[in-house]
Structure formats: C-alpha cells, structure tokens
C-alpha cells in the first residue's frame, strides 16, 4: 500500500514537470533546411530572462557568409544576417512555442510563427504563416546541430 501511494505521489509531481519541460527541448542549435534538403544556416534558440524565446542566426552556410539583409525593412535593413534575431517573442504553449514572429531574410518579410519539437524524429517543425491561426503559411523541418 505504501509503495502504491509513493508511486502515485511521484506521478503527480513528475508528470506536470515533464509537460512543462517540453519547450526546453527546443532550446539549442538548429540547422535550417531548404526545399532541397540542404542546410542554409545555423540558428541558436534560447530562452530569455523574461520567459520568451528567440532565435539568432549564428552562421550562414550558403552564399556570402557576410551578406546583408537588403530586403529587410526598419532597423534590420542592410544589417548583417549573421547575428540577426530572426525568431522573436515566442511563448510556451503546452509543448510548443507560439505567439511570436519569424523573419525570412531572403525576402525581408515577417511571419507569425509556431515551433513544435517532434519527439519521434528529434526535429523542429517550424511554421511561418500570414495569419495568427497558422492557416496560411508553410512548414520547415529544422535538424538539431550536433557539436
């Protein structure tokens, strides 16, 4: 009887922690993958002190590694893509991140974003969409960078 009680108590303590810990799998270094399956850039996703998540381009893997974001607008216009924060203001929503935006440096456009960790593959499913509900947009699969 004591054993069953201990198992039950442990389940109530550990189960919520497992749910809360899911977005932490998203933190780390990820390769963005183009439509042909090639690596385009290395993005570092981190959690900020205010609880939001962001993604910064650490390295460009194709073309000129020092190129500028010529198609961007505002403060990002003609700034180096390397070092640019392309994912902003993402918040935990269960086992995924939502509510923020993602910048596509190729066209300078900013899209609504959601990010989900795929437990079966270990990949990230990144969706950029025109609408906040994510109905009109496209998906990318990002691969974890191994040191």
Kindly give the residue locations of the regions a language model identified.
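Bacterial Sec-dependent N-terminal signal peptides
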Residues: 1-24
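Beta-strand residues in well-ordered beta-sheet regions across diverse protein folds
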Residues: 56, 125-127
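K/E-rich alpha-helical interaction surfaces of small helical-bundle regulatory domains
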Residues: 24-40, 138-146
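An exposure/low-complexity boundary signal
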Residues: 14, 104-124
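Edge beta-strand at a domain terminus
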Residues: 121-123, 130-147
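Central antiparallel beta-sheet cores of small beta-barrel/beta-sandwich binding domains
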Residues: 32-35, 39-113
């Amino acid at each position: 009887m004591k054993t069953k009680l201990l198992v039950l108590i442990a389940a109530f303590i550990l189960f919520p922690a497992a749910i809360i810990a899911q977005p932490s799998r998203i933190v780390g270094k990820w390769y963005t993958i183009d439509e042909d399956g090639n690596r385009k850039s290395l993005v570092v996703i981190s959690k900020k002190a205010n609880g939001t998540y962001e993604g910064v381009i650490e390295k460009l893997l194709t073309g000129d590694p020092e190129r500028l974001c010529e198609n961007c607008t505002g403060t990002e216009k003609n700034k180096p893509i390397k070092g640019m924060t392309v994912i902003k203001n993402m918040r935990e929503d269960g086992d995924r991140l939502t509510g923020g935006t993602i910048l596509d440096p190729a066209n300078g456009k900013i899209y609504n974003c959601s990010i989900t960790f795929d437990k079966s593959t270990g990949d990230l499913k990144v969706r950029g969409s025109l609408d906040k509900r994510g109905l009109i947009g496209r998906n990318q699969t990002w691969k974890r960078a191994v040191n």
